[in-house]
Design a protein with these regions (language model features):
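Cytosolic nucleotide-utilizing catalytic cores of signal-transduction proteins
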Residues: 1-191
């Protein structure tokens, strides 16, 4: 691409710089072509991260980190895609929260008892809770997603409430659980 030039590589990444006047659609077109060529030549689909615009060479490290964060988020989504960090602000916030001790404590306070129970007894309560929160407490959709009979789901929900002390009929509790699960996904990457 005439407005893109290669600036370096690491074992699992490469870097491109674009001129300031290039449109996002042109960057996307160029990245899709790179993705296609890598697949054609090496048989591998890659996730590409694109940082925000920088105005000084002093910002290269920050831009590199933002692009790497975009890649991490893209991989977490389970897709091999082109990820612009500017389109991933909420996920970026979760990624950053996962680094903070206060959020680690928040996650532990919310889920530690359940995680320990699942590990000790081989129960699927954490996954059940995650799915219930993703479906905003809708029991029918949760049961269908987990391929469970509604009575089995009702039993699991009662046990989860007993173990956590949480009221899973409360929308605020489900919101909190959903938030914690999103942060937890990025914490697990850091172990």
């Amino acid at each position: 691409h005439r407005q893109c030039f290669f600036v370096g590589n690491k074992s699992d990444s490469f870097h491109c710089l674009f001129t300031k006047d290039i449109e996002k659609s042109e960057i996307l077109k160029c990245m899709k072509e790179i993705q296609r060529q890598i697949y054609k030549n090496y048989g591998a689909w890659i996730t590409i991260g694109v940082s925000t615009e920088i105005f000084s060479y002093h910002d290269f490290i920050m831009a590199y980190k933002k692009a790497r964060t975009a890649i991490t988020i893209g991989k977490k989504r389970g897709k091999r895609e082109i990820c612009f960090i500017e389109d991933l602000r909420l996920e970026e916030a979760f990624f950053e929260m996962a680094k903070m001790d206060i959020f680690r404590e928040f996650v532990d306070e919310t889920l530690l008892e359940l995680k320990m129970h699942d590990e000790k007894y081989g129960t699927p309560f954490l996954e059940t809770l995650k799915t219930l929160a993703e479906h905003h407490g809708a029991r029918k959709e949760t049961a269908e997603t987990l391929f469970l009979h509604r009575n089995t789901l009702a039993y699991r929900i009662r046990r989860i409430e007993q173990l956590t002390g949480a009221d899973l009929n409360d929308p605020d509790v489900l919101f909190q659980v959903n938030l914690v699960m999103k942060i937890l996904a990025y914490m697990e990457d850091r172990k």
